[in-house]
Amino acid sequence: MDSELSSWQKAAQAKRQAILDAIPQKWRIQRPVLPVDVTGKFIQGYLTPREIEITEADAVAITTQTTSGNWSAVEVTEAFCHRAAIAHQLVNCLHEIFFEDAIQVAKELDEHLAATGKPKGPLHGLPVSLKDQFHVKGVDTTMGYVGWIGTYQGKKDDPRHRVAESELVRELRSLGAVLFCKTSVPVTLMAGETANHIIGYTWNPKNRNLSSGGSSGGEGALIALRGSPAGFGTDIGGSVRIPASFNGLFGLRPSAGRMPYEGAANSIDGQNTILSVIGPLATSIGGLKLLFKAILSQEPWQYDPLSLPLPWRDDIENKTKQLISEKSTASRLSFGIMRHDGLVEPQPPVKVAIDFMEHILRDLGHQCADSSQSKIYNLDGGEDLLSHIALSGEAQIPQCSVEPGKHFNAREVAALNVQKREYQKRYMDYWNGTARLTTTGRPVDAVICPTAPHAAVIPGKYRHTGYTTFINTLDYTSLVFPVGNADKNIPSMIERSEFLSELDQKIFGDYDAEIYYGAPVGLQLIGKRLEEEKIITIAEYLCEQVRFYTGQEDLVNSSTDA
């Protein structure tokens, strides 16, 4: 059979087996017919009570224990390595496994704490996972390309292979984090699903009939299974927010320049019209905030020429808290509600989530106002993406396929940049103009809108990224938070006779209440450019309210049950 395989298929198969071989034999599991939902009690069945206690804790709770010495970094690291190994065997979410190196780092952290009485940093002993765009010493960065296996970004015999480390990795190590795995991505990174020829398709842990999202889909799936308490992805069109939404997690798309991108691999590197940004994903809003603040404390602008000199701004956080606590309706926060983007209406579960959030906000005395809503990515006609696929001769993945297109020249790129700037100005004027609609006399403080037209999507049916990509064009801050799960008993919304577009009708026709049942639904909380402190603080408040209104467990310090 192997003799019938092409060279790229053999290379992919060997890499896939190498990933499995990196899992200790004692952590291998037999794969019977799996249930649809492999979260919660199912994956817990492979763990000890102590491992469950550790891995169900969020990043804030873990660092409270590790920095004080109540939990050893080794014990915490081993627990998450075990759970991550199981997670990969259930949903195909890992590209690189370096558990032994992680446990050695954890031992050194324990020795440091014992010798000095002080933690190495605020992330001391915290396991952190990474999307397979970040270079880590000793392991590959394939980004899903078979042609990148055993190379440095497709370059054979490059001395940087398995030696170079991304700036984010260096800073995480300085903060005391324990890096232990890298997670799956779709080839090209330009997809709302995650699939490649190395590990196959990354499934949604809550519903294995559905996608984990993309392009940080491996991060979403792993963290949803509590195989990691928090990690980092990247976002150029929704690639942090979509997996966060599809997996019931928290995900932040900060404005460009807040997180250090130096030394990370990327598709279409050098394309500056819309910048890819790094953002954290976590099981709690507290964990998200912890990671974001910790990286800023390292002053990344000293090491990355594109990072902005903006530390965490306590004054903005405190001012936002003051607005939240205002008793006067005339001074309180106000919100824009974007029900659809003018092209595609969301499917029923997402509509329910939007209506629910508006009900909560109005019930709390906040004003809500309706909010309304290219040729940016393929400036090289897809040439960069196709060239990396061509390195091995591998076939294209249907969800990530790229067709050769027009190669834009410098004049045309400049014209697109002018269009982008004009769009940004129009939207800025529109946002500022909402001051006429609010009782505060201020523009709306934030906008709530869908992350996608659907809950976690049926494979092959991610058809519309409009709810996320416009935010990248604006370079606005966006934070995804979980609201609930799809309910199949919403008959009043399953009939429509009028549609915004042919695509709208097609996406509505994709809806299947039985298949989507139980799928996580998240929404976006959007702020203007560089408003991360404000949006994170508002999200903390909103999560408390969602918990109160739904009776869910504490969304501030742990997400919905996984």
Describe each region flagged by the PLM.
Residues 41-50, 124-151, 209, 327-338, ...:
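Short helix-loop capping/hinge segments that flank enzyme active sites or metal/cofactor-binding pockets
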Residues 42, 253-355, 391-395, 548-562:
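A short helix-breaking turn/cap at a secondary-structure junction
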Residues 69, 125, 174, 178-180, ...:
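Glycine-rich, small-residue loops and helix-cap segments
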Residues 80, 102, 288, 335, ...:
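Residue-level signal for inorganic ion chemistry
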Residues 112-144, 165, 178-185, 361:
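Conserved small-residue hinge/capping positions at short loops/turns
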Residues 162, 166, 170-295, 474-482, ...:
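Short glycine/serine-rich loop segments
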